[in-house]
From Swiss-Prot:
<dbReference type="Pfam" id="PF02367">
    <property type="entry name" value="TsaE"/>
</dbReference>
<feature type="binding site">
    <location>
        <begin position="46"/>
        <end position="51"/>
    </location>
    <ligand>
        <name>ATP</name>
    </ligand>
</feature>
<dbReference type="GO" id="GO:0005737">
    <property type="term" value="C:cytoplasm"/>
</dbReference>
<feature type="binding site">
    <location>
        <position position="141"/>
    </location>
    <ligand>
        <name>ATP</name>
    </ligand>
</feature>
<dbReference type="GO" id="GO:0005524">
    <property type="term" value="F:ATP binding"/>
</dbReference>
<keyword id="KW-0819">tRNA processing</keyword>
<keyword id="KW-0067">ATP-binding</keyword>
<protein>
    <recommendedName>
        <fullName>tRNA threonylcarbamoyladenosine biosynthesis protein TsaE</fullName>
    </recommendedName>
</protein>
<dbReference type="GO" id="GO:0046872">
    <property type="term" value="F:metal ion binding"/>
</dbReference>
<keyword id="KW-0547">Nucleotide-binding</keyword>
<dbReference type="InterPro" id="IPR027417">
    <property type="entry name" value="P-loop_NTPase"/>
</dbReference>
<keyword id="KW-0479">Metal-binding</keyword>
<keyword id="KW-0460">Magnesium</keyword>
<keyword id="KW-0963">Cytoplasm</keyword>
<dbReference type="GO" id="GO:0002949">
    <property type="term" value="P:tRNA threonylcarbamoyladenosine modification"/>
</dbReference>
<comment type="similarity">
    <text>Belongs to the TsaE family.</text>
</comment>
<feature type="binding site">
    <location>
        <position position="50"/>
    </location>
    <ligand>
        <name>Mg(2+)</name>
    </ligand>
</feature>
Length: 162
């Protein structure tokens, strides 16, 4: 399946049978999203947010291991097709997030534009003008569900045409 075939221009729910399915969704997004794309990730602990970002890295041809930046807050991976900026706001309060000036990542200020993936994005006091929200929830027997919602954009606005 390609991202074009998914036609996610409004909220779409995708069943993810296992960890590999979550990884594959990330790979698909990494292969097709363009620089400037922002993915806001929500979900309980262990729901698959980091796994999805690991897939993004694979889709971007990043070879170094993608790890959760829970304690470093931001991990930057710049050797792929385009850079990946992986943020984790789990330990922060909204006022602390405000002081990070996250807009430098999605506006490409002082950094090379890339894909921005933010775990625990519900802690953000403000959001970019356009983004994709991905809510990961638990299903039965280890499965997950991804609820993907574009805000002020369509997926087709964000994908690279070949």
């Amino acid at each position: 399946m390609t991202i074009d075939q998914m036609t996610i221009d409004q909220m779409t729910k995708i069943f993810l049978a296992d960890k590999e399915s979550t990884l594959n969704l990330g790979i698909l997004l990494g292969e097709t999203l363009t620089a400037g794309s922002v993915i806001l990730l929500e979900g309980d602990l262990g729901a698959g947010k980091t796994t999805l970002v690991q897939g993004l890295g694979k889709g971007l041809s990043i070879t170094e291991p993608i790890v959760s930046p829970t304690f470093t807050l931001i991990n930057e991976y710049t050797e792929g097709r385009i850079p990946l900026y992986h943020l984790d706001l789990y330990r922060l309060e909204p006022q602390e997030v405000l002081s990070l000036n996250l807009e430098i990542y999605w506006e490409g200020i002082e950094i090379i534009p890339g894909i921005v993936a933010i775990e625990w994005s519900e802690r953000m006091p403000y959001k970019p003008s356009t983004y994709i929200n991905v809510l990961l929830t638990y299903g039965d027997e280890g499965s997950r569900q991804a609820e993907i919602t574009p805000f002020n954009c369509t997926i087709s606005d964000l994908i690279a045409t070949k």
